[in-house]
């Protein structure tokens, strides 16, 4: 059996961390590499009265390129439009900067919810979303490491703070 890529593992850990009283739906990706789907986001969460539209990204680097290959413009724009059009829709990106071992130190993982208003502004102004920028414009999502996987503290009220 093929080893799951780290991004899929992150999505799985995220889904398993969503509280039981929150509706959670993962939008399926296309398995056809020739015709990529144009999904607005990866996850739809509902906790009355809010609907959350979330796109998840994971990297081992210190930044996410705003290159179309990494962060899709249609996702940024569609999430922004939904967020602005509907009062009880909250959209954003969840950026996971995976931990890694360097020669001199261990860099712990960091995960942030970036509200779409801030993400859109950064997407059009910056060449990348560096971890320091995510820390400044986002809301940190606490985690704890189990043996090999992660559990995230998904408190949706925190997503409404910025």
Give residue ranges: language-model regions.
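Mg2+/Mn2+-dependent nuclease catalytic core
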Residues: 59-85
């Amino acid at each position: 059996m093929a080893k799951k890529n780290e991004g899929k593992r992150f999505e799985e850990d995220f889904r398993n961390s969503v509280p039981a009283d929150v509706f959670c739906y993962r939008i399926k990706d296309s398995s056809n590499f020739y015709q990529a789907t144009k999904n607005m986001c990866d996850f739809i969460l509902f906790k009355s009265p809010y609907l959350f539209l979330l796109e998840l990204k994971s990297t081992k680097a210190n930044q996410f390129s705003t290159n179309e290959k990494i962060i899709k413009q249609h996702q940024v724009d569609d999430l922004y439009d939904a967020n602005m059009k509907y009062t009880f829709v909250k959209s954003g990106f969840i950026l996971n900067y995976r931990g890694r071992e360097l020669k001199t130190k261990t860099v712990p993982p960091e995960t942030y919810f970036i509200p779409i208003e801030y993400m859109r502004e950064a997407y059009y102004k910056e060449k990348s979303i560096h971890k320091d920028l995510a820390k400044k414009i986002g809301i940190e999502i606490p985690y704890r490491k189990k043996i090999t996987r992660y559990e995230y503290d998904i408190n949706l009220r925190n997503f409404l703070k910025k």
